[in-house]
Amino acid sequence: MEINEKLLRQIIEDVLRDMKGSDKPVSFNAPAASTAPQTAAPAGDGFLTEVGEARQGTQQDEVIIAVGPAFGLAQTVNIVGLPHKSILREVIAGIEEEGIKARVIRCFKSSDVAFVAVEGNRLSGSGISIGIQSKGTTVIHQQGLPPLSNLELFPQAPLLTLETYRQIGKNAARYAKRESPQPVPTLNDQMARPKYQAKSAILHIKETKYVVTGKNPQELRVAL
């Protein structure tokens, strides 16, 4: 396969420029006490707002959507340009169409979609979660499974359509209802991996910059 070196160089330069501009010192010391009232901080373009630490769910009729640390922040579209807002809209719609509630959290301890999903299923009342990386890679996970095991994995993010994301939501809800749905059908393109491999790696590195060791997941209010 012919590699477009000019395009690859441009992608790398753009990402490095963005990363350089967003460098911040990281401190693990406890923040100084403040007398100012705390308010929820908007994330990204404002459709996601952190509203506090995510709590353990008690209702079995919920599925948690656990997103990566840069989702809706440094990255607002997936690897092929689908807006994160649209992706969440479809996943939530799919869950709700099955009569199940959706809860969205942001995970900070890892940028790996499997570990993001595991944090989600541990807090999910049903034990079912959907993990979504900022680049779009998605997994349906179940409490009790090892991180690298799953119910359904969607590794080829460039081939995931909005309709696919909706079907992922529907299947996750069916698992929450203890059903055994047929796996979501997906496209398969052997050239997708080599075509997007460099960009995928760069986007993963970019998301990893937002990992905060030891930080617990945050509940997100979603404005769609």
From Swiss-Prot:
Keywords: Bacterial microcompartment, Cobalamin, Cobalt, Lyase. Its EC number is 4.2.1.28. Pathway: Polyol metabolism; 1,2-propanediol degradation. It is found in: Bacterial microcompartment. It catalyses: propane-1,2-diol = propanal + H2O. Its cofactor is adenosylcob(III)alamin. Disruption phenotype: Cells lacking this gene are defective in aerobic degradation of propanediol and display no propanediol dehydratase activity. A triple pduC-pduD-pduE deletion releases no acetaldehyde when grown on propanediol. The keyword Zinc-finger does not apply. It is an enzyme of class 4 (lyase). Induction: BMC production is induced by growth on 1,2-PD vitamin B12 medium. By either propanediol or glycerol. Residues 1-18 are annotated as: Targets protein to the BMC. It holds the Pfam family Dehydratase_MU. Inhibited by glycerol. GO terms for cellular component: propanediol degradation polyhedral organelle. Bacterial microcompartments (BMC) 100-200 nm in cross section are formed during aerobic growth on minimal 1,2-PD-B12 or anaerobic growth on 1,2-PD-tetrathionate medium, but not during aerobic growth on glucose, anerobic growth on glucose or pyruvate-tetrathionate. BMCs can constitute up to 10% of total cell protein. The propanediol dehydratase enzyme is a heterotrimeric complex composed of a large (PduC), a medium (PduD) and a small (PduE) subunit. Belongs to the diol/glycerol dehydratase medium subunit family. The first 18 residues targets this enzyme and foreign proteins (tested with GST and eGFP) to the BMC. The cargo is only detected by Western blot in broken shells, strongly suggesting this protein is normally found inside the BMC and not on its exterior. PduD and PduP compete for encapsulation in BMCs, suggesting PduD also binds to PduA and/or PduJ. This is Propanediol dehydratase medium subunit.
